[in-house]
């Protein structure tokens, strides 16, 4: 009678396994559309698909299945193949983005959109209309504002739509164009900040170089290189993004995302290393260059301060003001882009789709991603505000330009447009310093 317990144990184990298989198959029949996320999907693909108010219980990600409705495993498959097709354990609670967050996100995005267009357009008009503002640093700031304006006009409306809507109605051309413009505008911002930091060090290191009116040839070359390099680095985005048809709750949706399977080895490598590449080049690089050249600039100031002539002290104050402005722009950039890069790095380091507690982390990362997108968009509209607060010259010119836009068209005269900035700056102590330094250099 000794084999009886062993036989009963085997029967009990068989019943448990049968119940488990039946439960898994029942779950698959009940929630076929949003059952599992393909393991190749990156974190920004979590962003691109529709984000409903709540996802069905048992879903392990915020994206629908990128395939046809699931089929039952065939009897001829091996045990290893069946284990690979089984989905991860279901979530204990739903993954959701509440309607309140959607409304707040929409309001914030609209506010950033309006402020960004007004601020960057005003900044470009100030530099274009007034010859006294056309110098090397200001032309780089104008390039920065133009890149921000492209980001605001193209990306912010699309990001708001992706959060509120389900389908992608814009076609494959816009699917490739939007991420291309986004990466190009970010590249323009990053490289412009790097060029500004290097330019400030060169201005302090060469005390004999007096700032004048006009665009230096080297600055023009820098701007051309910045735009060309930014466009070239954004080409993989246009190549990798594509339209995918996804099965979601019984209906097929068109989704724009970085395709899970790329055609070339380079694009597959780019897809796997994309988030680390964005973090290192588009975030760490400008911070490292700014820290390096501002350290050299500080050492140069301390070394030459005692030996400078008194007449150059006022000119030094002007360069310090410009350096402070550039430093504020870099600091604002770091604070605005940190949440977005942090969410993507956390996704790569902490998220495990086989973890039973992954759903809470995924909900947190999804919300953090949208907060990061809003903060990154905020960087595009906050640069003119930072210039208004830090620089007296930009503040006076902003006041003049906004007042001119509030007046009627008949009251505008070309002579006032050309001389108003100079009138404001004539009352500014910084302009007197600049004029005295020019007199000293001419003598």
Swiss-Prot record:
Matching Gene3D superfamilies, A to Z?
Rhodopsin 7-helix transmembrane proteins
Which residues are recorded as modified (Phosphoserine)?
306, 420, 441-443
What is a biological process (GO) this protein takes part in? endothelin receptor signaling pathway
Per the record, which residues fall in region Disordered?
51-89
Main location, first listed in the record: membrane
- The residue range of the signal peptide is 1-26
Q: Where is the lipid attached (S-palmitoyl cysteine)?
A: 403-404, 406
List the Extracellular topological domains. 27-102, 165-176, 245-272, 352-363
Q: How does it sit in the membrane?
A: Multi-pass membrane protein
The Gene Ontology CC terms held by the record are:
plasma membrane
Residue spans crossing the bilayer: 103-127, 139-164, 177-198, 220-244, 273-297, 326-351, 364-390
Keywords associated with the record: Cell membrane, Disease variant, Disulfide bond, G-protein coupled receptor, Glycoprotein, Lipoprotein, Membrane, Palmitate, Phosphoprotein, Receptor, Signal, Transducer, Transmembrane, Transmembrane helix
Under the heading PROSITE patterns, the entry gives: G_PROTEIN_RECEP_F1_1, G_PROTEIN_RECEP_F1_2
Q: Which domain of life is it from?
A: Eukaryota
SMART domains named among the record's database cross-references: 7TM_GPCR_Srsx
Question: Does the entry feature the keyword Membrane, yes or no?
Answer: yes
Topological domain spans for side Cytoplasmic: 128-138, 199-219, 298-325, 391-443
> So which residues have sugars stuck on them?
60
Give the matching InterPro entries. Endthln_rcpt, ETB_rcpt, GPCR_endothelin_rcpt, GPCR_Rhodpsn, GPCR_Rhodpsn_7TM
Question: Which Pfam families does the UniProt record give?
Answer: 7tm_1
- Polar residues compositional bias, start-end: 51-62
Similarity field: Belongs to the G-protein coupled receptor 1 family. Endothelin receptor subfamily. EDNRB sub-subfamily.
Which disease is noted in the annotation? Defects in EDNRB are a cause of overo lethal white syndrome (OLWS) also known as lethal white foal syndrome (LWFS). It is an inherited syndrome of foals born to American paint horse parents of the overo coat-pattern lineage. Affected foals are totally or almost totally white and die within days from complications due to intestinal aganglionosis.
- What is this protein identified as? Endothelin receptor type B
**Lineage of the organism:** Eukaryota, Metazoa, Chordata, Craniata, Vertebrata
């Amino acid at each position: 009678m000794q084999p009886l317990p062993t036989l009963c144990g085997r029967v009990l184990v068989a019943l448990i396994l049968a119940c488990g298989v039946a439960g898994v198959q029942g779950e698959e029949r009940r929630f076929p559309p949003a059952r599992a996320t393909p393991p190749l999907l990156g974190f920004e693909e979590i962003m691109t698909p529709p984000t409903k108010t709540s996802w069905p219980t048992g879903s392990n990600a915020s994206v629908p299945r990128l395939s046809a409705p699931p089929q039952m495993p065939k009897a001829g498959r091996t045990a290893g193949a069946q284990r690979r097709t089984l989905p991860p354990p279901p979530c204990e609670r739903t993954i959701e983005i509440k309607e309140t967050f959607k409304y707040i996100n929409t309001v914030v995005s609209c506010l950033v959109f309006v402020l960004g267009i007004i601020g960057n357009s005003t900044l470009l008009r100030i530099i274009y209309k007034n010859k006294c503002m056309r110098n090397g640093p200001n032309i780089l700031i104008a390039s920065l504002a133009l890149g921000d304006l492209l980001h605001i006009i193209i990306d912010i409306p699309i990001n708001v739509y992706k959060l509120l809507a389900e389908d992608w109605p814009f076609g494959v051309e816009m699917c490739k164009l939007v991420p291309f413009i986004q990466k190009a505008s970010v590249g323009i911002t990053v490289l412009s900040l790097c060029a500004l930091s290097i330019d400030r060090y060169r201005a302090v290191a060469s005390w004999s170089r007096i700032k004048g009116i006009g665009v230096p040839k080297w600055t023009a070359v820098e701007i051309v290189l910045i735009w060309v390099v930014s466009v070239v680095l954004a080409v993989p985005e246009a190549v990798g993004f594509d339209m995918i048809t996804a099965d979601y709750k019984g209906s097929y949706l068109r989704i724009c995302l970085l395709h899970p399977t790329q055609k070339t080895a380079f694009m597959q490598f780019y897809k796997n290393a994309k988030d680390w590449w964005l973090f290192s080049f588009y975030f760490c690089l400008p911070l490292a260059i700014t820290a390096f050249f501002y350290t050299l600039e500080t050492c140069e100031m301390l070394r030459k301060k005692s030996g400078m002539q008194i007449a150059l002290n006022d000119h030094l104050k002007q360069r310090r003001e410009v350096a402070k402005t550039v430093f504020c722009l870099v600091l604002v950039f770091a604070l605005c882009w940190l949440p977005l890069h942090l969410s993507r790095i956390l996704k790569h380091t902490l998220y495990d789709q086989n973890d039973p507690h992954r759903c809470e982390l995924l909900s947190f990362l999804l919300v953090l991603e949208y907060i990061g997108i809003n903060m990154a968009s905020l960087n595009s509209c906050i640069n003119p505000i930072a210039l208004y607060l830090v620089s007296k010259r930009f503040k006076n010119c902003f006041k003049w330009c906004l007042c001119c836009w509030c007046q009627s068209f008949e009251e505008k005269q070309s002579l006032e447009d050309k001389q108003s900035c100079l009138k404001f700056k004539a009352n500014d102590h910084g302009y007197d310093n600049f004029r005295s330094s020019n007199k000293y250099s001419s003598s």
